[in-house]
Structure formats: C-alpha cells, structure tokens
A protein has these predicted regions:
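Hydrophobic, small-residue-rich transmembrane alpha-helices and their short perimembrane loops
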Residues: 1-150
Length: 150
C-alpha cells in the first residue's frame, strides 16, 4: 500500500474505532468499579475520561519521549511515524466526541436540573469537543518536528 495512503487510512480507521469508544464513555467509566475489571480497561477508561489538563500532561510525556535519542536499531523517523498516527487518532477521537455530543444535543437541551429549571449545554463545550485534543497534539507534533530536524 502507498505509504501516504497508509498514513491517512490508519489514523482514520483507528479514529473511527476509538470514536465508538467515546460513544460508550459512560459505560467505560462504570467498568473500573467492577472487582474483576482488567487493568487495560481501567487504563482505557482513564484515557477516554481524561480532562484537557490530563491530556496535555500525556502529550508532554509523549513529546519528552519523542525528543530522546532513538533506541539502537530503531531509527528516529519510526518514532515520528508513531506520534504522527497517535496525534491523528487523538484528533479524530476529539472530533468523534464532538459529533456524539452534537447528535445528542436535542436530548441534552431537554433535561431539567435539580432546581427543576431546564438545562442547556454551552456552545463552548461543543467547540471544546471538536478542537481540544487536535490542538494539544498539533502543538506536541510541532515540538517533535523541531526535535527531529535539529
């Protein structure tokens, strides 16, 4: 397969699959409470439910790892490809999160708060769903690109 097509196809496919994970976000958050819950499910639930600050922390760790010298026998460009894919996947996850929120918007607007008054979802939350993670990983991607070229 053409490497350029592969670079486009893999993140999109992974993003779609992980977008489905976002659709079951509440289900994933409930899973870690089970005593027999596997550790990888706990990790996945933690990543999916992470706040913007936590995602930024993860991104900083990834940038630090990417900036370190390559392991013997593993060229640095291989690490660059991994982070290229990871950045795209996380961006698509955020997009999927925003789309799921948009699809549920009419139902969300109809809910009533504890005081009995109708609730509403602010537009800022929708914007955050679409742009939060891609922005974080675009920034980290820039750091990685600088490290690769220096």
């Amino acid at each position: 397969m053409n490497p350029i097509l592969l670079r486009l196809f893999v993140p999109v496919l992974a993003g779609v699959l992980l977008g489905l994970v976002f659709a079951f976000r509440g289900f994933l958050r409930a899973l870690p409470a089970a005593p027999d819950c596997p550790s990888f499910v706990r990790l996945l639930a933690g990543l999916v439910g992470a706040s913007p600050v936590t995602k930024l922390f993860y991104a900083a760790i990834l940038a630090f790892v990417a900036a370190t010298p390559g392991v013997e026998g593993v060229p640095r460009f291989a690490k660059a490809d991994v982070f290229f894919v990871a950045g795209n996947v996380m961006g698509l996850m955020a997009l999927a999160q925003g789309l799921v929120a948009a699809a549920r918007m009419p139902k969300m607007l109809a809910f009533r708060g504890p005081s009995g008054k109708p609730g509403a979802i602010p537009v800022s939350l929708m914007i955050q769903g679409f742009f939060e993670t891609p922005a974080i990983f675009a920034m980290v991607g820039g750091i990685i690109a600088l490290q690769m070229t220096n």
